[in-house]
């Protein structure tokens, strides 16, 4: 298989997983750096150039809320799930469980 084809398919597969992982991890409020580090520590590394546009998009869709706060003498933007985000996360978690079970049977 062509390496470019594999890379494109791999990125497509990861995209949906990243959305679910970010939403799940923002059940508790975090700022971008701590979110990125936590996901990496759990085995899901994500580039800043991917994370921050994703956070902005999820916020514009009403799934996240954010606010600027000073911490350690620096301004940081903290993110958390909105009410709609929490409902969407529940739906996506259920969808993930079904897909995961199906894929485990298929593979």
Regions picked out by a protein language model, each given a short descriptive name:
Residues 61-74, 80:
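Beta-hairpin "wing" of winged helix-turn-helix
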Residues 10-50:
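N-terminal helix-turn-helix DNA-binding core of bacterial DNA-binding proteins
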């Amino acid at each position: 298989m062509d390496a470019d084809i594999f890379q494109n398919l791999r990125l497509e597969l990861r995209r949906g997983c990243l959305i679910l992982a970010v939403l799940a991890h923002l059940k508790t409020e975090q700022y971008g750096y701590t979110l990125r580090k936590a996901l990496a520590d759990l085995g899901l590394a994500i580039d800043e150039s991917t994370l921050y546009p994703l956070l902005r998009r999820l916020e514009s869709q009403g799934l996240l809320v954010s606010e600027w706060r000073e911490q350690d003498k620096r301004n940081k933007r903290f993110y958390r799930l909105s009410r709609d985000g929490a409902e969407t996360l529940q739906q996506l978690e259920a969808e993930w469980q079904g897909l995961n079970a199906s894929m485990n049977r298929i593979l």
